[in-house]
Each structure stands twice: as C-alpha cells, then as structure tokens.
Amino acid sequence: MDYSTRPDARILYDTLVPIWPDRGSALSYRNCFELLIAVILSAQCTDEQVNKVTPALFEAYPTPGDLAEASLADVESLVRTTGFFRAKAANIVGAATIIARDLGGTVPDTIEELVKLPGVGRKTANLIVSVCFGKPGIVVDTHVLRTARRLGLAPTDDPGKS
C-alpha cells in the first residue's frame, strides 16, 4: 500500500503543518557543506551544542578542501564536546576529502551519493536533499518511525523499508 496517499496520513499532515509551519533546522549553517557537517556532528548530541562548536570549526576550515587538509587531532579538539569526537572527526574529514577530491567541492544532491560519504546515513541524506536541494525527503529518526508505526502510517520498524 502506498502510505503517502492514505487519507489518515493526509489528515495528519494537514493538521501538523499549520502548527509547525517553519520546519527548518535548528542547526546554524550558511551553505550545504556546513549543514552536512553540522548534521554529522549532531548524532547523539543536541543542536545547541553543535551550534557552539561549528563557528570555530568553519572559521578554521571554511571549505571542503580546507577540512580535507586538516589534521585529525586539530579537528578532534574542535569537536570534542559533541561526543564520539574521534569518530565524528574522522567522518567529517573523510566526507570533506571525498567532496573536495571526487566531487569538485560540491555536496551531492542525491540520497544515493550522500550515503556513500562517511558518517552519512539515510536520515542525514534525506535532510540534505530536502533542505539544500528542495527535493522530497522525510527525516525519520527512531522516535518518528516508532510513532508512525503505532499510528499505522509505516509498515515496519525498519527505516530502510518504511
């Protein structure tokens, strides 16, 4: 069944949009590259904490090429307070390296290309294609998926199949 055309899904959508018309991100960013890096850093961290870290990070490394050339130790020290800082530093340097080296410095505009980047899963990819490129994409975390499943709007708890 195509869940996007269910009448109850439309009712839910039509009810929620007026309540939350501005569904933008709480993360601070100036371009798609900054949003991508901020979203990677936001895993298991509050947007508020990410917003405290990113100004210094983007001042030091404003482009994918700059971040790709950064020492891992320097990036780790800048993102330390976001938790899991070693993995996050490796992921953002890795993503920046691929973007700079293989993609001409441009953030990919498809989910398929985005999920190839270190630290990027479907949730992050959907957010980027939706916010940056205006393409349809629904950002679904475990809480949204669980609620959608309980409401009968999602057929499974598997995010890849919902």
Where in this protein do the model-derived segments appear?
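Catalytic cores of DNA base-excision repair glycosylases
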Residues: 2-162
